[in-house]
Amino acid sequence: MTEQEFAAKAAKTVKQIVNAIADKEYERIASFAQIDSSWVKPGQTQKEAFLEFGEWLDGQLAMWTEDEEREFVVDHFDESCLDDIELEEDKSFVTYNPTNSGEELDFWFEIEFNMDKNEQISVTFNVNI
């Protein structure tokens, strides 16, 4: 796989993640990505961990909505919010700066991509608060 093909696949995956978050379909993310182990409790499935992440995120957005007296949501994917993908031999990394009505939120998403010898890509999602 060329670097360009890898970068295109990575960007497509980030788009899927961000759009699932914007649509509040947190559980769906588990079908194409893992959540960082820091979000997973013992015995918890990836789907359950993504749902818990969604509860946390919804709580943050609700708190800001109440404090600012305007609605806070995560916008759908915007390519301009995607930083350049740091390509390495078998592990790559990218950050995505989510927005609310085009305004950056106070956290960002970190996505790590690992490629095995068969060129299969595994994806790990995290949030930097």
Regions found by a protein language model. Name each.
Residues 25-36:
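Short, well-ordered alpha-helical segments enriched in acidic and aromatic residues
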Residues 14-21, 33, 54-57, 61, ...:
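Amphipathic alpha-helical interface segments used for dimerization/assembly
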Residues 53-106:
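Surface-exposed, charged secondary-structure patches
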Residues 1-19, 23:
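Short, low-complexity N-terminal intrinsically disordered segments enriched in polar/charged residues
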Residues 37-55:
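Short, charge-rich amphipathic alpha-helical segments embedded
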Residues 99-129:
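Short beta-strand edge/turn micro-motifs at domain boundaries
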